[in-house]
From Swiss-Prot:
InterPro entries: ABT1/Esf2 (IPR039119), ABT1/ESF2_RRM (IPR034353), Nucleotide-bd_a/b_plait_sf (IPR012677), RBD_domain_sf (IPR035979). This is Pre-rRNA-processing protein esf2. It is found in: Nucleus, Nucleolus. Residues 281-305, 316-328 have a biased composition (Basic and acidic residues). It comes from Emericella nidulans (strain FGSC A4 / ATCC 38163 / CBS 112.46 / NRRL 194 / M139). Belongs to the ESF2/ABP1 family. Keywords: Nucleus, Ribosome biogenesis, RNA-binding, rRNA processing. The gene is esf2. Gene3D superfamilies: 3.30.70.330.
């Protein structure tokens, strides 16, 4: 039995390796992993079929060698398939990372472009003129009783005078002498201001509604009341808030002064009351001492009482100063005349 120097199975395997290495399609592997696996399976099946046909043609004498060589070829194919799978996986991971990095780069560029669009130069912002305040204010000198701010706003807006931005009403201050109300808790307002978004609307509202009835439903609460309003030319809401703040500060200052005066009067009253109490206590103690002394002296009790009753207090009188044109001699003559007249009368 002769041995061959040239091994056909090994040549087939090496040629297959070379063909596979030379014919590896990277683009197909990037497109789909499943397609590469399918191609590899079909190649392995074809190689197996070719090896089986060669085994049958080689004869029975070479059966053992062909089996061992076929087993080695299968192992090499298996290792080669594992290596290809690993390479495909690594290629897929690399492609995924590349795609992710590209996406992040694109998003970063888009965000930078948006930021540049939204960013305005500082010179334009500084040189930009302020918006003009085109609002108009209408003053209401009198209001219907128990009319609330939102009710006033709705009455004006239903007549087409809108939009209304702000409403301010001054609550009525009841004098302290007025009788106290118990049943009705609704507030009344003396006057008010309404700010319109447009000067034109404010002027038209004041011209059309002034000195007219409120109207509305015939049996309404404010139907017969009359509007009293005037458009304030050149008057802004900031001016109103400034005047209100000034008046509020003045009221608070007056209240503080009145409180300080009341505290001072109260302090003086308490001091006088305490002093009077102290004097009363001293007088009571003196009377008790006097009674004890009189009790010690049996016969002098009545005299002590009379002296206590007839006690007279003496006060030092100030002398009247004479003027420059008057003398003491003139005063004596006047006193003599008065004495003579009084003597004739009495």
């Amino acid at each position: 039995m002769t041995t061959r120097k040239h091994n056909e199975f090994l040549d087939i395997g090496t040629s297959d390796d070379e063909d596979n290495d030379a014919g590896y399609d990277s683009e197909a592997a990037e497109e789909s992993k499943g397609r590469t696996v399918k191609r590899r399976k079909t190649q392995s099946r074809e190689d197996g079929i070719e090896s089986a046909s060669e085994d049958e043609s080689s004869g029975g004498s070479e059966g053992e060698e062909s089996d061992t060589e076929a087993g080695g070829v299968r192992l090499r194919e298996k290792k080669r398939g594992q290596r290809d799978e690993y390479e495909n996986d690594s290629d897929d991971d690399g492609n995924y990372m590349n795609q992710e990095s590209q996406y992040l780069d694109v998003t970063a560029e888009v965000e930078k472009a948006k930021a540049k669009k939204n960013q305005k130069p500082l010179d334009k912002l500084k040189n930009k003129p302020p918006k003009k305040n085109k609002t108009g204010v209408v003053y209401f000198s009198s209001l219907p009783p128990y009319l609330k701010p939102f009710a006033l706003k709705s009455l004006l807006e239903t007549r087409g005078f809108k939009p209304i931005t702000k409403v301010f009403l001054t609550p009525a201050v009841r004098p302290p002498s007025a009788p106290r109300r118990r049943s009705n808790k609704r507030k009344t307002y003396t006057d008010g201001w309404v700010e319109f978004a447009s000067k034109k609307t404010a002027k038209i509202c004041a011209e059309t509604l002034n000195a007219t009835i409120v109207g509305g439903k015939k049996g309404g609460w404010y139907h017969d009341d009359v509007w009293n309003m005037k458009y304030l030319k050149g008057f802004k809401w900031a001016d109103l808030m400034e005047t209100q703040e000034r008046e509020r500060s003045e009221r608070e200052a007056k209240r503080r002064i009145e409180d300080a005066r009341a505290r001072k009067e109260e302090k003086v009253f308490l001091q006088g009351y305490e002093k009077g109490k102290m004097l009363e206590g001293i007088q009571k103690k003196n009377e008790e001492k006097r009674r004890k002394k009189m009790a010690d002296k049996d016969g002098h009790g009545d005299q002590g009482k009379e002296q206590a009753i007839n006690a007279r207090r003496l006060f030092k009188q100030n002398e009247v100063k004479l003027g420059r044109d008057k003398t003491s001699a003139d005063q004596t003559t006047v006193e003599e005349d008065t004495r003579r007249v009084l003597g004739k009368i009495f």
